[in-house]
């Protein structure tokens, strides 16, 4: 247990140069509200409602730092042309009384985009692209030093564009099987140079990205890293590795770590803490690929949700570092949130709970509610593909008309 005084979850907290009014973060979740690669008015409505409902910092998910860095068509992309739409989003959040973070990312070989500047999707190592089973892109390309330099520049520029757009923080996505995670994970990184082998070597490139972002915006914005504490797969990083990763990111100067888990392809249930309904799966037209994916699904364990399902792993990180940490993973009651604070975590990040109840934080603060209505069914994930974008199935669907309109239009 933590020996420090236990703060109230409703008390302010300092993250780098940023002061949050309380300790609640809306975790990044792909909302499907970015037609044409820019925020829609529905996305502005959602994030404004989240902070109006009490959340101190809301996170806009999956902002690609380049066209090559996209995973999905119509994914949010930070560029000069998209800035007016991002500004409309940040202005809406600020007017609603909250702060907003841009999650900046590069998909690497986890991509459904065939148009790119390289022959194959980039990754830590080349060869067979197992995550390409979902997209039909079966080969990936090993990054060389020039590729790394370009991606580092892209992340730094993405952070500067986020600052110009009015964001208060940037969250570097280092987990879940995207590019930086592909370097960190021994499942993906088979290099034999200074960027492969030991965990220290596998962190070398992600640390360079973090350093470039800190140098670019770290004096004006909070710089956050989200990563998978445990990958939940036999050949992947464990929580003990996750604790070492945290030490290195702390040493490099990150202002906050958001502690997640799992990988999109190998261990999605580790990430979400519960099984996925059949309708949540990507539908594949190629019969051979569809068969391979069906076989993979049959081997997945059935996982029943339990609150704070990642706490055992996150404790190992808390014991390893002194820096601020945000716990993510199954907090859906006041009792769980208070336990997180008592365990020494500085903030709590929530995704599904806040999609179900945008005003859950205010309900907790006023005493109107203790337990979330969220059932952890994971159907909100599939809702990102509907015309109105992500929403909880217990509520009304998102506004399809607003979701067709660019935020800055």
Provide a role label for each language-model segment:
Residues 1-409:
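Flavin-dependent oxidoreductase catalytic cores
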């Amino acid at each position: 247990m933590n020996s420090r005084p236990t703060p109230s979850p409703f008390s302010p907290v300092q993250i780098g140069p940023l002061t949050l009014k309380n300790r609640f973060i809306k975790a990044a979740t792909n909302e499907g509200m970015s037609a044409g690669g820019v925020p829609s008015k529905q996305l502005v409505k959602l994030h404004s409602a989240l902070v109006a409902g009490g959340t101190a910092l809301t996170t806009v998910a999956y902002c690609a730092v380049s066209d090559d860095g996209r995973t999905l068509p119509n994914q949010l992309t930070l560029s000069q042309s998209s800035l007016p739409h991002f500004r409309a989003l940040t202005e809406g959040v600020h007017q609603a009384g909250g702060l907003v973070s841009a999650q900046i990312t590069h998909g690497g070989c986890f991509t459904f985009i065939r148009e790119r500047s390289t022959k194959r999707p980039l990754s830590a190592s080349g060869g067979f692209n197992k995550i390409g089973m979902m997209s039909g892109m079966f080969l990936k390309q090993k990054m060389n030093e020039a590729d790394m330099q370009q991606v580092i520049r892209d992340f730094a520029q993405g952070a500067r564009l986020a600052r110009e757009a009015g964001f208060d923080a940037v969250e570097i996505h280092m987990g879940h099987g995207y590019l930086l995670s592909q370097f960190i994970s021994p499942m993906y990184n088979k290099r034999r140079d200074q960027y492969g082998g030991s965990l220290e070597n596998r962190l070398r490139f992600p640390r360079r990205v973090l350093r470039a972002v800190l140098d670019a915006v770290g004096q004006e914005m909070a710089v956050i890293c989200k990563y998978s504490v445990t990958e939940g797969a036999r050949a992947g990083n464990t929580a003990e590795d996750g604790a070492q990763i945290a030490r290195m990111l702390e040493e490099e100067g990150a202002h906050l770590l958001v502690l997640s888990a799992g990988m999109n392809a190998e261990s999605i249930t580790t990430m979400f803490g519960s099984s996925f309904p059949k309708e949540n799966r990507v539908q594949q037209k190629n019969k051979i690929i569809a068969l391979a994916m069906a076989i993979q699904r049959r081997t997945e364990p059935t996982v029943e949700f339990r609150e704070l399902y990642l706490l055992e792993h996150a404790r190992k990180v808390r014991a390893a570092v002194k820096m601020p940490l945000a716990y993510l993973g199954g907090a859906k009651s006041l009792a769980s949130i208070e336990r997180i604070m008592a365990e020494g975590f500085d903030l709590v990040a929530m995704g599904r709970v806040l999609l179900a109840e945008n005003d859950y934080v205010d309900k907790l603060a006023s005493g109107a509610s203790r337990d979330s209505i969220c059932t952890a069914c994971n159907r909100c994930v599939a809702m990102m593909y509907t015309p109105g974008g992500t929403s909880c199935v217990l509520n009304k669907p998102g506004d399809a008309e607003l979701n067709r309109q660019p935020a800055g239009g």
